[in-house]
């Protein structure tokens, strides 16, 4: 590395650390007090620790005080509390106790701590022979206290099947202990996992902890062909106890033609799933010891499928009065094959004394929106749900959902089915609900150039007897103080959301797919003279919302404009627009990106001669397509774990069905096979960036995660080597332990540091440009 390059690395790394060091809000809980005008909020905070290559986790508290004139005051704890080695924290319903989870490593037990308001009340060590680490991801994760706060249900890795044991005489029938060194364990049968992110993780299984005794029991009656998650307790029965557990189950026979295979589940809501019910394992002793003639007791049998009539059901939530079970469904994704699509919301009227063999009718609350009118509700697109989403009226739930290129907060009246946007309608910022506080909402808002700010929303009555939501800024927020340097670095930037008309729409397109798509434009002062980065999301059925991103903000601070395109196929714009892309990848999405670029060029917003492009996954697919199909329009490119050759990916990825869906469209499901036909392999190749590699001119930086199961490194390496063979300028960075996201802290840091240096080198940004 020459002196000039070394100086650039030093300068940019110092700048990037300013963005990396800022804390993030991961979640929050609100607890009521005896005073109805006061409550307490607990925040889960994380901060990147580059030296340790992990994230620090903190807990921070604030007291929320209101009065009759709607004045609001937040009193913050003086310092956050660091939670070393903690995998998850979950408060009890009353807020008087806290479960602290410390997942074991390398065969050590999992530690479950019950903390009250003054000390650790109990510490339970769960041996690996009972279960492995608890799931804390966004999909299988589920930890649920019962109302009496005596039992905790949770999802953990099941213990692996016993391995065959051998010694110098051959096979040992009786097995062996871990301490016996005179033998060795074989491998046994291969046990498939859920692909990307879940490599080497055990089967997600349901367990219940009795806090008083410290005993842990596995739920019974659940087939080993079912992976479970998102557990909640059903309301108390007539006996006054909560006897039943409700959970989500994913059948493992979801391969082609219903064959046994766990197709990858990360980022894929199209995996069939149902709500199930089973008896709490600590109720079984009552059943087993009862007289055979006692017909009032239910047998401890198999788990019951509560939603057999719908192909997808997840995020179960009971209303506060226990009369409704509400859940989301991705049945449109399951039925169409798109890996994400428009969600729907449903409810079940829950009987006060339900029996496991009792039929439950499903009613629609929010249906799928096909083609939204301009400015109207586009449908539900929810990647998560609050553990307690209910306002104090007991019939209104709070959801966070994508709404075109923004994220908004919605209130849903589950009785009438009315969806209302309660975050400001005239705001291009993105909003996300953190917690419900009675009839109020604690939230966070941000933009591409504004770090997250905590907001507090409450309803105000108007003269016409209607209500509106008012959002107050939270005073003395210590998290904002940590972001002051970042705000100063972005103070000369602005952003807007552009509506991009579809050019020359064909007659065979649906109405929804002819409507404008959008791009988020982050610009410097005098943007027309600054270089621009075209930023492309993956999926293709994911969305770039107008929220704060540390890495995007870093690139903007270097003096780049950012054009972040939500091409057709992006969630948040109605189902017709989303479904217009499958079967047309490499053409429709490529054209949308070029149309967005033309829009800002023709508007005089950017310099057409200074354009770079970057994307991850399907965004990398588009990046490598664009530099091949439009080689004279891009000076430089960077691709992170890109899809470059579908015909190679089909045999190596954890989601081969994705290859059929994006290339073949609606016909993909019927043709999908583990042994693609020559015609399909030819089609996959024709729709891939590698088909255009001979035309590439732009220098390309390729960043690969060595442990990526979604787009294995063979895909990127084949393209990179083929480009090098043709004399192209290519630089490869490999992160051996990283998965598809490349999100290990040091890898993430080094990735974007090199992207910044690479782009500045090939776009010739001066120091004065970056500071302007």
Curated annotation (Swiss-Prot):
Record keyword Cytoplasm present: yes
Keywords, sorted A to Z: Cytoplasm, Hydrolase
Its EC number(s): 3.4.19.1
Location(s) in or outside the cell: Cytoplasm
Subunit details: Homotetramer.
Function: Catalyzes the hydrolysis of the N-terminal peptide bond of an N-acetylated peptide to generate an N-acetylated amino acid and a peptide with a free N-terminus.
Protein name: Acylamino-acid-releasing enzyme 2
Native organism: Oryza sativa subsp. japonica
């Amino acid at each position: 590395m020459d002196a000039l390059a070394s100086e650039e690395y030093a300068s940019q790394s110092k700048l990037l650390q300013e963005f990396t060091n800022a804390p993030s809000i991961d979640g929050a809980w609100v607890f009521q007090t005896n005073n109805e005008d006061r409550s307490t909020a607990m925040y889960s905070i994380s901060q990147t620790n580059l030296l340790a290559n992990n994230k620090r986790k903190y807990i921070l508290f604030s007291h929320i005080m209101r009065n009759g004139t709607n004045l609001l005051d937040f009193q913050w704890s003086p310092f956050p509390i660091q939670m070393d080695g903690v995998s998850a924290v979950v408060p009890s319903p009353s807020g008087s106790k806290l479960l602290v989870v410390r997942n074991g490593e390398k065969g050590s037990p999992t530690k479950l701590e019950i903390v009250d308001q003054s000390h650790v009340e109990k510490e339970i060590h769960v041996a690996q022979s009972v279960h492995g680490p608890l799931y804390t991801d966004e999909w299988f994760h589920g930890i649920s206290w019962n109302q009496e706060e005596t039992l905790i249900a949770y999802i953990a890795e099941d213990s692996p099947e016993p391995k065959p044991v051998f010694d110098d005489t051959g096979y040992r029938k009786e097995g062996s202990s871990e301490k016996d060194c005179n033998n060795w364990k074989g491998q046994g049968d291969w046990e498939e996992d859920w692909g990307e992110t879940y490599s080497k993780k055990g089967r997600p299984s349901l367990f219940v902890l009795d806090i008083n005794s410290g005993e842990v029991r596995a739920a019974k009656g659940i087939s080993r062909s079912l992976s479970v998650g998102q557990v909640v307790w059903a309301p108390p029965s007539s006996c006054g106890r909560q006897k039943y557990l409700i959970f989500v189950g994913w059948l493992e026979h979801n391969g082609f033609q219903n064959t046994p295979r766990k197709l990858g589940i990360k980022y894929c809501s199209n995996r069939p799933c149902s709500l199930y019910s089973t008896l709490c394992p600590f109720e079984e002793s009552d059943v087993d010891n009862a007289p055979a003639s006692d017909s009032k007791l239910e047998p401890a049998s198999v788990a019951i499928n509560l939603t057999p009539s719908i192909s997808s059901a997840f995020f179960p939530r009971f209303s506060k009065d226990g009369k409704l079970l509400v859940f989301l469904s991705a049945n449109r994704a399951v039925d169409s094959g798109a890996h994400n699509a428009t969600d729907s919301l449903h409810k079940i009227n829950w009987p006060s004394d339900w029996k496991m063999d009792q039929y439950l009718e499903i009613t629609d609350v929010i249906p799928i929106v096909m083609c939204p009118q301009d400015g109207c509700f586009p449908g539900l697109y929810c990647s998560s749900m609050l553990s307690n989403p209910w306002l104090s009226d007991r019939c209104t739930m709070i959801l966070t959902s994508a709404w075109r290129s923004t994220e908004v907060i919605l209130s849903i009246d589950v009785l009438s089915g009315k969806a209302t946007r309660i975050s400001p309608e005239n705001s291009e910022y993105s909003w996300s609900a953190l917690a419900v506080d009675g009839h109020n909402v604690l939230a966070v808002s941000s933009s591409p150039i504004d770090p997250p700010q905590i907001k507090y929303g409450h309803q105000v009555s108007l003269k016409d007897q209607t209500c509106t939501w008012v959002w107050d800024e939270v005073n003395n927020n210590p998290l904002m103080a940590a972001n002051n340097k970042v705000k100063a670095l972005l103070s000369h930037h602005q952003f807007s959301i552009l509506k991009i008309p579809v050019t020359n729409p064909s007659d065979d397109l649906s109405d929804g797919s002819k409507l404008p798509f959008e791009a988020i434009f982050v610009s410097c002062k005098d943007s027309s003279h600054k270089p621009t980065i075209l930023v492309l999301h993956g999926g293709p059925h994911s969305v770039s919302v107008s929220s704060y991103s540390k890495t995007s903000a870093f690139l903007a601070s270097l003096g780049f404009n950012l054009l972040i395109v939500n091409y057709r196929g992006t969630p948040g714009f109605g189902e017709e627009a989303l479904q217009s892309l499958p079967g047309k990848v490499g053409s429709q999405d490529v054209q949308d990106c070029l149309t967005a670029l033309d829009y800002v060029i023709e508007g005089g917003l950017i310099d057409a001669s200074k354009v770079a492009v970057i994307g991850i996954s399907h965004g990398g697919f588009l990046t490598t397509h664009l530099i091949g199909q439009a080689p004279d329009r891009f000076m430089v490119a960077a691709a992170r774990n890109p899809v470059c050759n579908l015909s190679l990916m089909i045999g190596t990825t954890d989601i081969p069905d994705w290859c059929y869906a994006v290339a073949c469209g609606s016909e993909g499901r019927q043709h999908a096979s583990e042994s693609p036909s020559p015609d399909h392999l030819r089609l996959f190749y024709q729709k891939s960036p590698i088909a255009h590699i001979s035309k590439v001119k732009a220098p390309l930086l390729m960043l690969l995660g060595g442990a990526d199961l979604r787009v294995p490194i063979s895909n990127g390496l084949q393209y990179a080597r083929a480009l090098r063979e043709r004399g192209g300028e290519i630089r490869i960075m490999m992160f051996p332990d990283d998965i598809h996201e490349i999100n290990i802290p040091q890898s993430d840091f080094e990735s974007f540091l090199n992207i910044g240096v690479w782009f500045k080198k090939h776009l010739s940004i001066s120091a004065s440009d970056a500071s302007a």
